[in-house]
Each structure stands twice: as structure tokens, then as C-alpha cells.
Amino acid sequence: MYDIKWIRDNPEVFDQGRKRRGLEPLAARLLELDDARRGAIAKLQVAQERRNAASKEIGQAMAAKDQAKADALMAEVSALKRDLPELEAAERAAAALLDKALSEIPNLPLEEVPFGRDENDNREHHTFGEKPRFSFDPAEHYELGETLGLMDFETAAKLSGARFVVNKGPLARLERALGAFMLDLHTGEHGYTEVNPPILVRDDAMFGTAQLPKFENDQFWARPGAHPLLIDMFGREEAEEMKKNRLWLIPTAEVPLTNLVRESILDEKQLPLRFTASTPCFRAEAGSAGRDTRGMIRQHQFTKVELVSITTPEQALAEHERMLSCAEEVLKRLKLPYRVVTLCTGDMGFASQKTYDIEVWLPGQDRYREISSVSVCGDFQARRMNARYRPEGAKNTRFVHTLNGSGVAVGRALVAVLENYQTEDGSIIVPDALAPYMGGITRIEKPALERPNSEKPVSRA
């Protein structure tokens, strides 16, 4: 969220940043709204000051035994008191219009971010690993999972509808192992503090990380004691009351982890703070109709290990590179080939100043697919959360800078392991990095199959 004072002082810079995102100029309109707010504040202050002055003059007139003047002043004060609620309402309305407009503005890209319209203009940063070579046509993950009898979309659809899955047996254990491996790596070697946060959060938390109001229709929400769809049956007042009591299912652990510092003032010596969590995540995928309708790539519910850092402005860019390397290390340990791309201005997320995507190679699809996004957000989220820190030796506070990244998406990591570690008979070799978590299971296969002497399909450096 941007400071209107900064926009007033830098309207051309602001509009130029929007242009790089492919957006229309907006500074003039925002300054009109700010002028209206400032005008409403001025009118309210004039009325309040006159009320206070007239109230004081009443006492003076009474002391001077000037009843006529006192009566006139009392009438004036009464009129001002009648007018003040309307002036206060006008000030609140003007402020609300400005706040709404500001809350819907995306973050501006850093100068180093490549210009572009969409994902086709993203730039490859670097690659890691060699793509596996198979002596057979590699299958997609859902073909492998269903053939093994361990990935069940039909039952999931009966339970919950489309875009859900039931994983069973050693496949469920493999998914659990992936999450545990990631958490152990990030906490044991990368210095992150593990957190087990709520997965139901209030509006303020979703606003703080900028999921609201822009992406309200992409989220799932619930209200104790009433189905959310019943909102259409109520009037405006009842609907607003329901909204006050609603809770949101988190689309990412970025929401609760980043909001751990909302409405707080930290000491500089505490920074950077680094948090990680493995949570279920929930997304409506409202804009994804017809995309990835089969398999686990795009689900309403999925597990993700999240990384969040809270830093000073001076630490933020170095922390961004560090977070990227932490996420990459997951795939390196799993020996999964991947590439890193720098997102262009037209493909960046709403709250991001700069984003790297890590895309893992999926042989079954014969393409790279996103498995992690790592973003630096500047003070964009901190302003929405009112999260500050006090520099050493300083009286005034500054907004912290926030960063977030997937470390990584557990479901997509499972997909990548299935496709990269498949064998010709359809069984799956368990990556060496996951062996400590699998209770002796080194190969996932149909219960009736016994292939103890099968070799891995490809050597992995």
C-alpha cells in the first residue's frame, strides 16, 4: 500500500512505475481524492475550532452579563453540534474512498525488473541439473499415481468436488516426508523458526498481505454457524454483520506468518526475522477454468512449506537472494532439475517488487512448471499491517520490509518426484534425501509387484 504523501511528492515516478506494469496513470485521480479528504478534514476542523471558541465565549459573555450575546453563542454552538456529525461522516467517507483506491493499487516494480506483458516475457536466470533420459515414454504423475492405486481423484470428487485428491499408503507417506524434509532443512540449516499458525484468519490479516480486497473472489471463507452462500438470502445490514464474523481459509502461510509482526514495533537488532511453516492452503482458482483439470498441479487444497522474512530496507535485497537459494536447495537435495526465471513487470504478483519463480522439470509434461515464487515486497505489506522497527539510536520508527517464498509447494514436489523418479514398470524410486523419512521404503510400487532388483532409470549427479 502506498503512502499518499509519497504519491503527492512523486506523481510522475508513481505513474511511470504503473506504466511499466502495463497500467494507466492514476496519480491525478488519487490526488483529487486526497484533496477531497483534506478539504473535508479542513471543514471539520474549522467547525470544531469554532465550536470550542464559541463555547469559551459563552462563559465570557455570561461573566459580562451579556445575555443576548450568550444566547446567540449558545444557538451557534447548538447549530455546530448538529452539523458536526454530518461533517464527520463526510470526512470518513472521503477517507474511505481514498483508502479503498490506495488498497487496490499493486506494488511498483524495482527498476531492475525486466519489462514485459506476461509470462512469455519472463527471463531465464539460470538452470540446475540435467533432465532425466528415459528409454520409454514418461507418464504424467496422475497416470502413475492412479496405476499404482495410490492416487484417487474419483473418491475425492465424491467427497469434495473437482480439484481435490486422496493420496494413500506409501504415496501419502512420501508427501508427508517431503514436507518434513523441507522443514528440517529450513530450520536446521537455513535459520528459519518453525511456526504452526492458524489456517483461519480475519479480514485484517488478509488485508495486511494484500489478498484483500483485490482477490476476495479467489478465496474461501467461512462463518461459524452459517453457510457463507446464505449471504445472498440476507439484506445489506445482515450481510455486513456476517462479513464482520467471517474467517478466511489461508491461500498461503504467507498470510499468518507475515502478520505475526502486524501492529508491532521491533528493535533493529531483532532483524531479520525468518519464519517457516507447512500448512494446507486453499484457493478457489476462480480464473483457472479449463487449466490443469487433471492431476495435482492446480488444486483447491494443497500443502506448501512457506518462507517469510522480516527485514530492514537495507537487508531486503540480499535476503531475497538468500531466500531463493534456500528454496533452490530443496530441489538440489532431491536432485530435481529446475530453472529460475525473473518475472517481468506484467507477470508479477500484486504485492511484489521483484519475483523469482523456480520451475521444476516435469518429464511427463515435457515442460517446466512453477514450484516456488520468491518475492521481495518492500514496505508495501508493512504499511497495510502497520509493522515497524526502531533503528538503533533513533527516535523515529521505519516500516519493515517483507519477503515471502515457497520453500517449496509440497504437492508439486510430489508431482516432480513421481515424474522424475519413475521406472518403466510404473514404480517410483524414493529419492535418497527422503530415505530417513520413509521407514525403509525405497521404492513405491503396486502391492502385488515385486521388483527388488530394478535399477533407477537415470543417474543423477
UniProtKB/Swiss-Prot annotation:
Transmembrane segments: none annotated. One of its GO terms (biological process) is seryl-tRNA aminoacylation. The keyword Nucleotide-binding applies. GO terms for molecular function: ATP binding; serine-tRNA ligase activity. Pfam families: Seryl_tRNA_N, tRNA-synt_2b. Residues 112-134 are annotated as: Disordered. Keywords: Aminoacyl-tRNA synthetase, ATP-binding, Cytoplasm, Ligase, Nucleotide-binding, Protein biosynthesis. ATP binds at R283, A284, E285, E370, I371, S372, S373. SUPFAM superfamilies: Class II aaRS and biotin synthetases (SSF55681), tRNA-binding arm (SSF46589). Its EC number is 6.1.1.11. One of its GO terms (cellular component) is cytoplasm. L-serine binds at T252, A253, E254, E306, S406. It is found in: Cytoplasm. Pathway: Aminoacyl-tRNA biosynthesis; selenocysteinyl-tRNA(Sec) biosynthesis; L-seryl-tRNA(Sec) from L-serine and tRNA(Sec): step 1/1. It catalyses: tRNA(Ser) + L-serine + ATP = L-seryl-tRNA(Ser) + AMP + diphosphate + H(+); tRNA(Sec) + L-serine + ATP = L-seryl-tRNA(Sec) + AMP + diphosphate + H(+). Residues 114-134 have a biased composition (Basic and acidic residues). Its main location: cytoplasm. Consists of two distinct domains, a catalytic core and a N-terminal extension that is involved in tRNA binding. Homodimer. The tRNA molecule binds across the dimer. HAMAP family: Ser_tRNA_synth_type1. Belongs to the class-II aminoacyl-tRNA synthetase family. Type-1 seryl-tRNA synthetase subfamily. Catalyzes the attachment of serine to tRNA(Ser). Is also able to aminoacylate tRNA(Sec) with serine, to form the misacylated tRNA L-seryl-tRNA(Sec), which will be further converted into selenocysteinyl-tRNA(Sec). This is Serine--tRNA ligase. It comes from Methylocella silvestris (strain DSM 15510 / CIP 108128 / LMG 27833 / NCIMB 13906 / BL2). The lineage of its organism: Bacteria, Pseudomonadati, Pseudomonadota, Alphaproteobacteria, Hyphomicrobiales.
